Amino acid sequence: MMLLLSCLFTPIIWESSDSTFRNERLAPVKILFVNKFLYSRGGAETYFLKIGEELTRRGHEVEYFGMYDEKNTVGNALHLATTNMDFHNAGPEKLLYPFRILYSFEAKRKLKQVIGQFQPDLIHFNNINFQLTPSVICAGAECGVPMVQTVHDVQMLCPNHMMMEFNSKKLCEACMGKKSKWPCVKKRCIHGSLPKSLIGAVEGTLYECNHVYDKIDRFICPSAFLEKKLLTVPRFRGKTVMLHNFLSRVAAAAPAEKGDYVLYFGRLSEEKGIDRILEACKLLPDIPFVIAGSGPMEDLCKNCTLPNVKYVGFQTGKALEDLVAGALFTLHLSIWYENCPLALLESQSLGTPVLCNRIGGIPELVEEGRTGILNDTFTPAAYAEKIRALYADKPLLAEMSAHCIQKKDRMMTLERYCDQLLALYGDVVKNA
């Protein structure tokens, strides 16, 4: 191991459900990030790419391993990546996908080559299923490298990653903690497809039975909710750390001048409740709404003919910041177990209150009545009632906007997050 631990301590401490770690100032370390996508695509990619940038800035050595794509922005010295698997536009090669998504010998072989050349002190896994498969965990274990994994969703507990039935959209925990994932097949939980659900169930059952996740030294949970779910399964007990996600942009110093609109920004998908949001918009013809984002239900938003709804497409950077900062409040009405949604944090950091469903890890991020309002009934009519009341109460909105700005100093920053992450790395390596 090239990791050198000094005796200089900093006062950063955090607690998980099982133990307390103290941050130790570290000499330069070698970290290998593993994720199926190596370009900015979603929350998981933003997470590890930002961390990688910050660790590099601090003088640590960072390399990456994942799937080949022309859009990749990071990689490793050997320029190794697995063959691209495009489930939506694949040709005849997709006939081999059912075998490759269960166990990728290619990913395992190439990762071992990268490990051999880079000699990392620690491997940090993120999203690996399907395109890389947990075979990469076996590669790390066989090379004797300490490993941590950030748990971005409930995939380790549920084959469809959402704990929500595909057809009924009801929350479901039928597979949680069980070796057999047969309920996934019975309910056709993956895209409503029997073959896909069967493959997902086989994958989940395979990795439950061969205990591959036992090889991970520590699991980072972005919400107390997700940590609690993991701890219902004995193999995760004593291995979890809860760290809320960080803000990657600078928080606002004061509330911006507000426009006259309510905003939804983020992924346009059913689990995010975008269809129900549009139904609520229909019930509120006098309230202007703006929708920004992309995703599976993008056409529904593009083709929306409601005069009070404006779809502005995918936004990023300064344009998105201005849009969020200028909104009266933002909507976060997911119907699935959200983990630690960055959009919710970003809205509050820019001085914009939030209206959220009380589900998953969302309540942990909202000071009810101060930075946002929580909703308990997930119907368009209930949404409309909450939106109407909040839209009409401009003094409350102004007060909550001020509280959001005050809260920014208590939010997790990238710098603070990396301090705590390095402490965790040091603890894992010392005890490996």
Task: Give residue spans per PLM region.
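Conserved donor-binding/catalytic core segment of Leloir-type glycosyltransferases
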Residues: 220, 247, 254-272, 278-284, ...
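Short acidic/histidine- and often glycine-rich active-site loop of Leloir-type glycosyltransferases
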Residues: 344, 359-369, 373-375
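Nucleotide-activated donor-binding/catalytic signature segment of Leloir-type glycosyltransferases, i.e.
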Residues: 299-322
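Conserved acidic donor-binding segment of nucleotide-sugar-dependent glycosyltransferases
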Residues: 368-369, 373-380, 389-394
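A short, well-ordered alpha-helix in the C-terminal region of glycosyltransferases
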Residues: 382, 389, 396-411, 417-423
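Acidic donor-binding loop of glycosyltransferase active sites
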Residues: 325-339, 352
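Carbohydrate-associated surface elements
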Residues: 225, 246
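Membrane-proximal helix-turn-helix segments that form the acceptor-binding/catalytic region
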Residues: 142, 155, 170-218
